[in-house]
Amino acid sequence: MRMRHLKTAVMPAKGDPITGRVVVFGNSDVEMAMCVPAEKMDYFYKNAMGDECIFIHFGSGTVHTMFGTLKFGPKDYVIIPKGIVYRMTFDKTKDGEQAPRFVVFETANGSHIGPPPRYLSKKTSQFLEHAPYCERDLRMPELPLTFDKKGEYEVRIKARDLVHSYMYTHHPLDVVGWDGCYYPYCFNVDDFSPIVGKLHMPPPIHQTFEGHNFVICSFCPRLLDFHPDAIPVPYNHSNLDSDEILYYVEGNYKARKGIEPGSISVHPQGIPHGPHPGTVEKSLGARETSELAVMCDTFRPMFPTKAAMAFDDLAYPQSWEGEHFPVSLDQHHADGAHRKPAAPTKVKSKTAAKKGKPTKSAKDVGSTWQ
C-alpha cells in the first residue's frame, strides 16, 4: 500500500468503447476503467450488473439508447443505469483534436449512481436551492426512436461476471415511447456550480454523484478561499475512512507537481499526504484556480490492477522528500526496489479467496482487478 501516480496519457488506443476499457482500480463496490477506443461498436451492449458513470475527457459523439439519443462532448458525465441497451459512437476526430478518451465508474454491488440525497427535497425529490446543480442542467434522451427493421442484431449482455452474446431478429432500439424516472442522461461538469468559502472547504462540497460505499466529486475552476490569511491549497491530512483517487482533466492543480492531463493520483486510507514541497508558498495570494479533476472516494480499499502498474510512476512517493512526514515505502520500494520495475501484487476477491481460485470476470469489458 502506497501513494501512486499513474501516467495514463500514454495509454494506447485499443478496442471499441466497451472492449477497449482497461480497469485500473476496483473493489467489491466499484470499478474504475480507462478507455481510448480505436474501433467502432458494431453491436449493442447491456450492462445487467451495474450502473455506469462515464466521464468524457476528449471526443464527442452519440449514445444511442432504447430511450432515444444522447449527444455528448468533452467534460460530459454520461449516466447509464443498468439494464439499458445502448451503443456508443464517436464523431470523426478533426485535425489537431485529441483522440477520444473517457473514464468509467461502474458499480459492482448492485447500487445505483445518482445525486447525493442531501441535494434533494425529501418531500418532492427536486433539487434544493443549495445544490451545485439542478434538473435544468441534466440533458435527457432526445426523441424516442423507432427502428422498424428486421435482421440480425447482436446484443452483448454483461451478467454473472461474463459477457453473453445474443442475436435479435429485430432492432434492439425499436421502442415507440417511454415514461417514468429511470433513464440515461448527460451532465456537463462546466454546469457544476462550485461552493466556495472564506476558509478551506472540505471535499464533500465537490460531490457530484454517489453509489453505495463511494462518491464521485468534481474539482472545478473556482474562486479560492478569501480570508486574508487563508492558505488556498489543502493542508496535510490522512483519509481515515476512504481511498482517494483523482483523475486530472485540465488546468493547473496547485497542490501537486508533475501532474498532467490524464494523470491519476491515488492516496490510500491512512497514509498522510498534502501539498508538495514549495506549493504552499506559491499558492499564497492566489485568487482562483483553473484546475479540473474528477475524484472517486471509496469507503473500502481499492486495489490496482496489473494493467494499472504499466503506468505507475515509481518515484511518486519520493516527491514529498523534505516534508515533515516520512516517505512511504512498501514492498516494491524497500532497499532500492523502487528503482526497478515492480511486479504487480495479485489480489483476489472475497469470493475467489473462499474458493481458492481467481474470480472469472467479463473478458470483453476488462474486469481484471480480481
Q: What label would you give each PLM region?
A:
Residues 1-370:
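Jelly-roll (double-stranded beta-helix
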